[in-house]
Amino acid sequence: MKPARELTAFMDRLGYVFEDPALLARALTHSSLSSPTRGDNQRLEFLGDRVLGLVMAEAVLAADTDAKEGTLAPRFNALVRKEACADVARQIDLGAAMRLGKSEMSAGGRRRMALLGDAMEAVIAAVYLDGGFASARDLVLRLWSERVQSVEEDARDAKTALQEWAQARGMAPPTYTEVARSGPDHAPVFRVRVTLSSGENAEAQAKAKRQAEQQAAKDLLAQLAGE
């Protein structure tokens, strides 16, 4: 088990104090370190995914009471996808608290998007089991607040607009490529390039990959409008 001080430090970053710290320890334990006497976070990940989904479904419904299902679904998906969970995990430096086996440690597991996203969902489940749905809901809404606002502001976002522009001209959908990543593991900066099948492209950078993609799409739309 992680030393108590390390769990306490992570609870400070998380903004939630566990009545049962063993739940948090389990949520932070990857299967590469599990054993018959020490479980991993896979079952908690399964539960946390459902808790996150319910909270986000409520959030997108509350944010736009007139929106139809067809417009709500993309917003919901943007909030619950693994990349979003991993971004939140990086913000609270969850990677530093993860308990990994030697193989995952040497493979850079603390930085891997899939592992971070899974662990974030497991932590949500641990909070749910420790303090109930209200505690889990408060945690998720606090950690996802900027994303919820951003998704609502970008209900018809630049990526969608660029894709529609391309489709209207019989072109393939735009492609997005991560061309660079800098900064510390817990606060990376992503640089992304968007490219049309006709060759036009633009690059942008941001602290979240989705934001970089949005900005690149916005810049390319502006470039196309000026032609």
From Swiss-Prot:
Main location: cytoplasm
Start and end residues of each RNase III domain: 7-132
SMART domains named in the record: DSRM, RIBOc
Pfam families the UniProt entry points to: dsrm, Ribonucleas_3_3
Gene3D superfamilies for the chain: 3.30.160.20, Ribonuclease III domain
SUPFAM superfamilies for this protein: dsRNA-binding domain-like, RNase III domain-like
Family that this chain belongs to: Belongs to the ribonuclease III family.
InterPro entries: dsRBD_dom (IPR014720), RNase_III (IPR011907), RNase_III_dom (IPR000999), RNase_III_sf (IPR036389)
CDD domains: DSRM_RNAse_III_family (cd10845), RIBOc (cd00593)
Function, in words: Digests double-stranded RNA. Involved in the processing of primary rRNA transcript to yield the immediate precursors to the large and small rRNAs (23S and 16S). Processes some mRNAs, and tRNAs when they are encoded in the rRNA operon. Processes pre-crRNA and tracrRNA of type II CRISPR loci if present in the organism.
EC id: 3.1.26.3
Molecular-function GO term, any one: double-stranded RNA binding
Keyword Magnesium in record: yes
UniProt-listed GO biological process terms: mRNA processing; regulation of gene expression; rRNA processing; tRNA processing
Subunit structure, interactors included: Homodimer.
Keywords: Cytoplasm, Endonuclease, Hydrolase, Magnesium, Metal-binding, mRNA processing, Nuclease, RNA-binding, rRNA processing, rRNA-binding, tRNA processing
Catalytic reaction equation(s): Endonucleolytic cleavage to 5'-phosphomonoester
Domain of life (superkingdom): Bacteria
Essential cofactor(s): Mg(2+)
Protein name listed in UniProt: Ribonuclease 3
PROSITE patterns, sorted: DS_RBD (PS50137), RNASE_3_1 (PS00517), RNASE_3_2 (PS50142)
Residues annotated as catalytic: 49, 121
Annotated positions binding Mg(2+): 45, 118, 121
Annotated DRBM domain residues: 157-226
A Gene Ontology term for the protein's cellular component: cytoplasm
Organism of provenance: Jannaschia sp. (strain CCS1)
Subcellular location: Cytoplasm
